[in-house]
């Protein structure tokens, strides 16, 4: 006994003259860009960060940022204050540079204070990255390195 299966149509029937187009890609992140934990990209290009409170269903909104790095650093700040030094971070080497000296570790801080600290770090990182980009844009490649103090 031979059982024959019909092949599932991969494309809907197309009338003559119709042009099939590919569906727009929802994922706007390029394949070579690293995905960070705790962040996502809005349709219009802003990056947002949020974190779930331990043992609760509620989330702490950490803000929206121009860059993925700023949103990820805001997330790192929040997760560090919520879970302590054992937390898995996007940028483990940067956490102490952000002024997270250890006060309020392990859930001692209120969600409002965590949100405030994370927003400060994210905004600072966004500002630093914007300043870096401006400096690169203003760099005159026709000048000699000595003109820049190099």
Swiss-Prot record:
GO terms for biological process: ethylene-activated signaling pathway. CDD domains: AP2. This is Ethylene-responsive transcription factor RAP2-9. Probably acts as a transcriptional activator. Binds to the GCC-box pathogenesis-related promoter element. May be involved in the regulation of gene expression by stress factors and by components of stress signal transduction pathways. It comes from Arabidopsis thaliana (Mouse-ear cress). It is found in: Nucleus. PANTHER family: ETHYLENE-RESPONSIVE TRANSCRIPTION FACTOR RAP2-1-RELATED. GO terms for molecular function: DNA binding; DNA-binding transcription factor activity.
